[in-house]
Amino acid sequence: MVAAVATAWLLLWAAACAQSEQDFYDFKAVNIRGKLVSLEKYRGSVSLVVNVASECGFTDQNYRALQQLQRDLGPHHFNVLAFPCNQFGQQEPDTNREIENFARRTYSVSFPMFSKIAVTGTGAHPAFKYLTQTSGKEPTWNFWKYLVDPDGKVVGAWDPTVPVAEIKPRITEQVMKLILRKREDL
């Protein structure tokens, strides 16, 4: 009996440890064109994960700033990962194809875009559940930004009122750390 209880506790402890070892890049998501993508492909680079919307008051300033950030820092060491979401004010009502066309045509977006998802509630995408749980900050509107380090750990989270320009130094710092780490590995 004691051995069975000890074994059960050991299994629970192992499961808890395995869950705590999970990181952002362990998840999969469907890209904007409908292909299942392992986020593992972004491991080893810094990611800024953003829930986007095409018809929001924050759309113009954020898409412009995010694309400039991608141009300045990406794609070898950094990527913006955009996840359209229609949960806040129904401001992303279009299809994935229309969302992609809008972003590429209007803002020349070159960063990866994913299919429309839920980012809060019981139907939230598992990657966003992870971002929310590990940062302690759940999106309450469009254009929440989560900074993920090369190992998949969340190292920052900002609400939509914080401009990309204000967090760019923090992102640049993460990218520089990554570049220095890669040089040391040579």
From Swiss-Prot:
<dbReference type="GO" id="GO:0006979">
    <property type="term" value="P:response to oxidative stress"/>
</dbReference>
<dbReference type="GO" id="GO:0004096">
    <property type="term" value="F:catalase activity"/>
</dbReference>
<protein>
    <recommendedName>
        <fullName>Glutathione peroxidase 7</fullName>
        <ecNumber>1.11.1.9</ecNumber>
    </recommendedName>
</protein>
<feature type="active site">
    <location>
        <position position="56"/>
    </location>
</feature>
<keyword id="KW-0575">Peroxidase</keyword>
<dbReference type="InterPro" id="IPR029760">
    <property type="entry name" value="GPX_CS"/>
</dbReference>
<comment type="similarity">
    <text>Belongs to the glutathione peroxidase family.</text>
</comment>
<dbReference type="InterPro" id="IPR029759">
    <property type="entry name" value="GPX_AS"/>
</dbReference>
<dbReference type="GO" id="GO:0005783">
    <property type="term" value="C:endoplasmic reticulum"/>
</dbReference>
<dbReference type="InterPro" id="IPR036249">
    <property type="entry name" value="Thioredoxin-like_sf"/>
</dbReference>
<dbReference type="InterPro" id="IPR000889">
    <property type="entry name" value="Glutathione_peroxidase"/>
</dbReference>
<dbReference type="GO" id="GO:0004602">
    <property type="term" value="F:glutathione peroxidase activity"/>
</dbReference>
<keyword id="KW-0964">Secreted</keyword>
<comment type="function">
    <text>It protects esophageal epithelia from hydrogen peroxide-induced oxidative stress. It suppresses acidic bile acid-induced reactive oxygen species (ROS) and protects against oxidative DNA damage and double-strand breaks.</text>
</comment>
<dbReference type="GO" id="GO:0005576">
    <property type="term" value="C:extracellular region"/>
</dbReference>
<dbReference type="InterPro" id="IPR013376">
    <property type="entry name" value="Glut_perox_Gpx7"/>
</dbReference>
<keyword id="KW-0732">Signal</keyword>
<feature type="signal peptide">
    <location>
        <begin position="1"/>
        <end position="18"/>
    </location>
</feature>
<keyword id="KW-0560">Oxidoreductase</keyword>
<dbReference type="Pfam" id="PF00255">
    <property type="entry name" value="GSHPx"/>
</dbReference>
